[in-house]
A protein has these predicted regions:
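A conserved beta-strand-loop-helix scaffold within acyl/acetyltransferase catalytic domains
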Residues: 2-63, 109-248
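A short glycine/small-residue-enriched secondary-structure motif
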Residues: 58-76
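A short, internal acetyl-CoA/4′-phosphopantetheine-binding micro-motif in the GNAT/acyltransferase core
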Residues: 71-82, 243-249
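Glycine-rich, often proline-containing surface loops adjacent to acidic residues and nearby aromatics
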Residues: 71-72, 102-105, 136-138
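Short, conserved charged micro-motifs
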Residues: 82-88
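Conserved acyl-CoA
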Residues: 88-103
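Conserved GNAT acetyl-CoA-binding A-motif
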Residues: 100-112
Length: 249
């Protein structure tokens, strides 16, 4: 007999999560996105005091969004969650939101390879529930299964040799260089006519809240920065390379 239930609202004290909450779904990060109205849903086993899944929506003008102002939100779930429970959880969420007066539900899933089994199920189940894809974004994912020095492919070796030949040097920057790294990337994008995806004030607030999750990198040639990137650790397995560029020279 099933012993899990679906609930609306925050978890009571004493509950243990059987899944990792991604950065953008953490309460602290959601409040950075907006301190307005949020609503949460969970799958729990009440007797065991454990939660198997969770999702959070920002409510505004009849629209429920997960996330509100972040690259992605959607459901975090235990790898042991039964597919049938996940499907019924989506039905429960939709029914409750519609009863609450919500007219539109927007869920932005992370890239499939972030959690392949969960994301594949979500894509199928949301389609079965007549959700439509309104935006599909391309991306690139690199599986890190070896060190930078353990290169087997010839093209990898060629790229490293080319970088050495033109005296490129990769440096990990300290967080006190955040403004300099941001300004470099921002200026590169401005010169190319690209928009900036984040303001420095928003970035600084997020870094201040989660300082241990960010990684700054710069590429130098003859002492001058020629490329830079800002990455953030979304969870224990994923480093998200979200803001980067290089100069045109």
């Amino acid at each position: 007999m099933e012993d899990f239930i679906f609930i609306k609202g925050t978890l009571s004290d004493g509950f243990k999560l059987e899944y990792e909450v991604s950065l953008f779904n953490l309460n602290e990060h959601r409040l950075l996105q907006s301190n307005g109205e949020w609503i949460s849903y969970h799958i729990i086993k009440e007797k065991k005091k454990v939660a198997l899944a969770g999702i959070h929506f920002h409510l505004s003008n009849g629209i429920a969004s997960s996330p509100y102002r972040s690259p992605f939100g959607s459901i975090d779930a235990s790898p042991d969650l039964e597919p049938s429970a996940l499907f019924r959880f989506l039905q429960f969420i939709e029914s409750d939101l519609l009863k609450s007066g919500v007219k539109s539900i927007i869920i932005k899933n992370p890239p499939t390879l972030f959690s392949p089994e969960l994301q594949t199920l979500l894509q199928v189940f949301l389609s079965n529930l007549n959700y439509q894809i309104i935006t599909a974004e391309p991306g690139a994912i690199f599986i890190v299964d070896k060190s930078g020095e353990d290169l087997s492919a010839n093209w990898e070796k060629r790229k490293i040799k080319q970088a050495h030949d033109i005296d490129l040097e990769l440096r990990h920057e300290e967080m006190n260089k955040l403004k300099a790294v941001y300004d470099f990337i921002h200026n590169c994008r401005f010169q190319k006519g690209y928009p900036s995806s984040i303001t420095f004030d928003d970035l600084q607030r997020t870094v201040s809240a989660f300082p241990g999750r960010f990684l700054l990198s710069g590429v130098y040639q003859q002492g001058a920065m020629v490329a830079a990137s800002i990455c953030v650790r979304c969870n224990q397995q994923v480093l998200y390379h979200f803001y980067s560029d290089h100069n045109t020279s």
